[in-house]
């Protein structure tokens, strides 16, 4: 992750300290919602400083249900909850922010929909995408998976 330039005042919604250990969920490691929530809580208690709920293969209502159960866990430990890709869900549950891919809603529209105080992160796969995200007002950039994951086959 790279933080945007302070002189641009773009990372006012998130601090470098909050980005020390960014967890991205992978439900393939859990057999049930209860097990997933227990694992998420353990990760947060072990030092995760921001948590992205990434549910690529889950129906909206189930995604919402999991997010609503995870939100108080994150709040208890003062860990921002980021919803992957789904701006509507992020607003509906009042999550701390959203992480957008290159094919998702653009940053400006997401910011208008969610509000100026929400965290917006963007995946960038090259310098051009990174600069576009920075100029578009992203609070942080995700630079891709470092390890093989069942949720990111490309």
PLM feature segments, named:
Residues 6-105, 112-139:
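Conserved N-terminal beta1-alpha1 strand-loop-helix module at the mouth
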Residues 53, 90, 147-153:
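A short acidic, helix-capping loop that chelates divalent metal ions and anchors anionic groups
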Residues 102-109, 142-152:
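Glycine-rich phosphate-binding active-site loops on the catalytic face of alpha/beta enzymes
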């Amino acid at each position: 992750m790279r933080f945007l330039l302070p002189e641009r005042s773009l990372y006012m919604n998130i601090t470098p300290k909050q980005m020390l250990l960014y967890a991205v969920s992978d439900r393939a490691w859990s057999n049930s919602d209860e097990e997933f929530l227990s694992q998420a809580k353990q990760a947060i208690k072990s030092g995760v400083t921001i948590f992205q709920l990434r549910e690529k293969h889950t129906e909206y209502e189930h995604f919402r249900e999991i997010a609503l159960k995870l939100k108080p866990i994150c709040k208890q430990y003062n860990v921002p909850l980021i919803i992957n890709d789904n701006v509507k869900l992020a607003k509906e549950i009042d999550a701390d922010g959203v992480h957008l891919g290159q094919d998702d809603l653009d940053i400006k529209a997401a910011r208008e929909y969610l509000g100026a105080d929400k965290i917006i992160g963007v995946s960038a796969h090259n310098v051009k995408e990174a600069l576009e995200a920075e100029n578009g007002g992203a609070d942080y950039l995700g630079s891709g998976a470092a390890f093989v994951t069942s949720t990111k086959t490309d």
